[in-house]
């Protein structure tokens, strides 16, 4: 586990974008695992800058998103389909057929999840998986006490996660209570993992992930066992290390 401490959010975002860009330059048909939420927004903005100013080419890149709210349609502004399109995809030359995001409106959850895992495998596996971390130590929507052997599945969202995500909605009551998410096993099969965190609110989760015992109570602690994980955090998130 490599830890990179930077000064602030902007530096974190640019550092992460450079790692992603280097991967794409090295392998033009790279497979990227992508995350949503507030943390990676700056990274996406910087990748768009690299596309516009340095001709970073996304035309052969494949992407798989970590998760999607269950019961939320693609065109809903709160969906992660909408987030990815409007914060990243539509500003690059990535091809629609290379974009993979779980279907939150599926009537066959088991098949949707199984097909997603199979498509990741058939693509050759994820080259770099981008992660954030929740205040409760979740990665993706893998909440505390998750089964480390779980693949992509339906999860019930933790109360802390619902509270944290309520800032994106008009009220807490509008936040979905479940989601489809890559499982820990799916995430751990990624060749490289890039975890981003900023702010003092994430400091305790970062400490437990890095220095705590490996336990389902802190899902991110499993990353101690991954052989190529880079943690990029600002000084505030690193304050307990």
UniProtKB/Swiss-Prot annotation:
Catalytic activity: alpha-D-glucosamine 6-phosphate + H2O = beta-D-fructose 6-phosphate + NH4(+)
GO cellular component, one term: cytoplasm
EC number(s) given by UniProt: 3.5.99.6
Cross-referenced PROSITE patterns: GLC_GALNAC_ISOMERASE
Stored NCBIfam families: nagB, PRK00443.1-4
Free-text function comment from the UniProt entry: Catalyzes the reversible isomerization-deamination of glucosamine 6-phosphate (GlcN6P) to form fructose 6-phosphate (Fru6P) and ammonium ion.
Protein name according to UniProt: Glucosamine-6-phosphate deaminase
Annotated organism of origin: Clostridium acetobutylicum (strain ATCC 824 / DSM 792 / JCM 1419 / IAM 19013 / LMG 5710 / NBRC 13948 / NRRL B-527 / VKM B-1787 / 2291 / W)
Taxonomic placement: Bacteria, Bacillati, Bacillota, Clostridia, Eubacteriales
């Amino acid at each position: 586990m490599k830890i990179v401490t930077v000064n602030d959010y902007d530096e974190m975002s640019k550092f992460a974008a450079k790692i992603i860009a280097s991967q794409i330059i090295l392998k033009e048909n790279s497979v990227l695992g992508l995350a949503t939420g507030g943390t990676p927004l700056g990274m996406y903005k910087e990748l768009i800058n690299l596309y516009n100013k340095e001709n970073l080419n996304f035309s052969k890149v494949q992407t798989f998103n970590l998760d999607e709210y269950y019961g939320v349609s693609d065109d809903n502004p709160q969906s992660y389909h909408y987030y990815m399109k409007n914060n990243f995809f539509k500003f690059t030359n990535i091809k629609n057929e290379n974009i993979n995001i779980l279907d939150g409106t599926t009537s066959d959850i088991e098949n949707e999840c199984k097909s997603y895992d199979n498509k990741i495998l058939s693509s050759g596996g994820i080259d770099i998986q981008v992660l954030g971390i929740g205040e409760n130590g979740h990665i993706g929507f893998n909440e505390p006490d998750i089964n480390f052997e779980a693949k992509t599945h339906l999860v019930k969202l933790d109360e802390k996660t619902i509270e944290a995500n309520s800032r994106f909605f008009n009220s807490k009551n509008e936040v979905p209570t479940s989601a489809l998410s890559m499982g820990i096993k799916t995430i751990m099969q990624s060749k490289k993992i890039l975890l981003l965190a900023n702010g003092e609110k994430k400091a305790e989760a970062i400490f437990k992930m890095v220095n705590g015992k490996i336990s389902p109570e802190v899902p991110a602690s499993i990353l101690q066992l991954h052989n190529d994980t880079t943690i990029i955090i600002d000084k505030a998130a690193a304050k307990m290390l």
